[in-house]
Amino acid sequence: MYLGKVIGTVVSTSKNESLSGTKLLVVARLTEKLIPDGSTQVVVDTVGAGNGEIVIVSCGSSARQSTGKDHSVIDAAVVGIVDTVETVN
C-alpha cells in the first residue's frame, strides 16, 4: 500500500468489461512527507474519494479483492481516505 493524492479522474467509455461501473481516479504517489514523488497511477475508487484528498492505495490481488471483483483487470484501488498522518522527524 502507499499514500497518494487524487489529482484527477478518468472517463473511459470503451474498456474491459470487468471495469464496468467503476470510478477511475488519477493518483499521485506521495513520499513519507506527503510530497508527490513524480509518479502517477490510474486506480479504482472504492470509497468515494475526491480531487485533492490524500488516500490509501492498495495494489495487486488485494486491490481486486477490495472491489469484490476477484477476476478483474484491476491492479490498484483506493481503499481509504486519510484524515491525518504522523511521522517521526
Curated annotation (Swiss-Prot):
Subunit note: Homopentamer with a small central pore.
The keyword Protein biosynthesis appears for this protein: no
UniProt name for this protein: Bacterial microcompartment shell vertex protein GrpN
Gene3D superfamilies: EutN/Ccml
Occurrences of domain BMV (ranges): 1-83
Entry-linked PROSITE patterns: BMV
Family: Belongs to the CcmL/EutN family.
Lineage: Bacteria, Pseudomonadati, Pseudomonadota, Alphaproteobacteria, Rhodospirillales
Signal sequence interval, chain numbering: none
One cellular component term from this protein's GO annotations in UniProt: bacterial microcompartment
Keyword terms: Bacterial microcompartment
Task of the protein: Probably forms vertices in the bacterial microcompartment (BMC) predicted to be involved in glycyl radical-based 1,2-propanediol metabolism in this organism.
Keyword Transferase on entry: no
Species this chain originates from: Rhodospirillum rubrum (strain F11)
Subcellular location: Bacterial microcompartment
